[in-house]
A protein has these predicted regions:
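Transmembrane beta-strands of outer-membrane beta-barrel proteins
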Residues: 27-33, 53, 64-66, 81-85, ...
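Sequence/structural signature of outer-membrane beta-barrel proteins
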Residues: 36-42, 90-96, 118-122, 136-144, ...
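Transmembrane beta-barrel domains of Gram-negative outer membranes and organellar outer membranes
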Residues: 32-121, 134, 191-192, 196-205, ...
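Outer-membrane beta-barrel transmembrane domain signature
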Residues: 146-227, 235-242, 247
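Outer-membrane beta-barrel "beta-signal"
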Residues: 54-58, 223, 251-275
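Residues on the lipid-exposed face of transmembrane beta-strands in outer-membrane beta-barrel proteins
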Residues: 33-37, 53-59, 70-75, 111-119, ...
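Short loop/turn motifs that connect adjacent beta-strands in outer-membrane beta-barrel proteins
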Residues: 21-27, 42-43, 62-81, 120-129, ...
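Residues that define the transmembrane beta-barrel architecture of outer-membrane proteins
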Residues: 27, 47-53, 79, 105-111, ...
Length: 275
């Protein structure tokens, strides 16, 4: 079962997601409220809405950053290439009709390297296009046990626009990519063992491979003393190796979220926000 603390940790990266400008404090801290409507899993027709107080944390160090929809450590950087350690996660799924009689899905935590290649960057750094190649190991845990559930690879194109649509201070991020998952990952989310098979839910297993596509748009603005932002994401599992799983009830999912945070403290040291 997901505790409030766990949910807050999952939403930290969203609340700190798009705080970008030319010069910003080394760190910022505050508190806010976030709301998001999230499917139980990709391909599920059941959604959960989370409305929770969340911490607002941003750190823009040379080696470790908490921003840009993720917590990541930078191990290597040139003008064209960065090598990061990225983290991600997803909430649990319980009381799902398609999985009735099957074990609930625990929250997952993802971590692994990401190779980021800058394809274009305007001279004023207000427009950036990059290819991101993250490969993350996935574990599931209810904090009483830990289960390894495979790997996920999500190559994507990411476009960041500062002062979007000629509106000063508004930052827009657009991302589109593919999803690939291994056999263990697909077994965790989409397999039906014979013991759980029913007349309406036949046994199913899938190997690893193509797992669909995703498109994300996020917008935010930092005002004096507070921050606002929102996002919308579309996912498709059309053509995925697990598309025919009886646990897949829809081929398309939409995820939306919104957050507002009040910034109570900030570093006097200013640094350039490179993302």
């Amino acid at each position: 079962m997901l505790t409030r603390l766990q949910t807050c940790l999952l939403l930290v990266c969203f609340c700190a997601s798009l705080a970008r400008a030319e010069q910003l404090p080394l760190w910022e801290a505050g508190v806010g409220i976030g709301a998001a409507t999230i499917p139980h899993y990709r391909g599920s027709n059941k959604y959960q809405t989370w409305i929770l107080p969340v911490p607002y944390l941003v750190y823009r160090g040379d080696l470790v950053k908490v921003e840009d929809r993720r917590l990541h450590g930078r191990f290597f950087k040139t003008d064209k290439v960065e090598f990061d350690l990225s983290l991600y996660g997803s909430p649990p799924a319980k009381d799902n009709d398609a999985r009735r009689g099957m074990p609930d899905l625990d929250p997952t935590f993802e971590f692994g390297p990401s190779l980021d290649i800058f394809l274009f960057r305007s001279p004023d750094k207000k427009r950036t296009l990059e290819l991101r190649l993250p490969a993350r190991k996935v574990i599931a845990s209810d904090f009483s046990r830990v289960e390894q559930v495979g790997w996920i690879f999500q190559p994507s194109l990411n476009l960041d626009l500062k002062n979007a649509l000629e509106h000063p201070g508004w930052n827009l991020g657009l991302q589109a990519g593919l999803v690939y998952t291994d056999r263990r990952y697909n077994r965790y989310f989409y397999a039906v063992d014979p013991i759980f098979a029913t007349a309406d839910r036949p046994a199913f297993s899938a190997g690893g491979g193509y797992a669909g596509t995703g498109v994300l748009a996020a917008i935010s603005k930092r005002f004096p003393g507070f921050w606002v932002g929102g996002f919308a994401k579309w996912d498709s599992v059309v053509g995925a190796v697990f598309e025919d799983s009886p646990l897949v009830k829809t081929r398309h999912n939409f995820t939306t979220g919104f957050g507002i945070a009040w910034i109570f403290g900030a570093s006097t040291q200013m640094v350039e926000a490179t993302r």
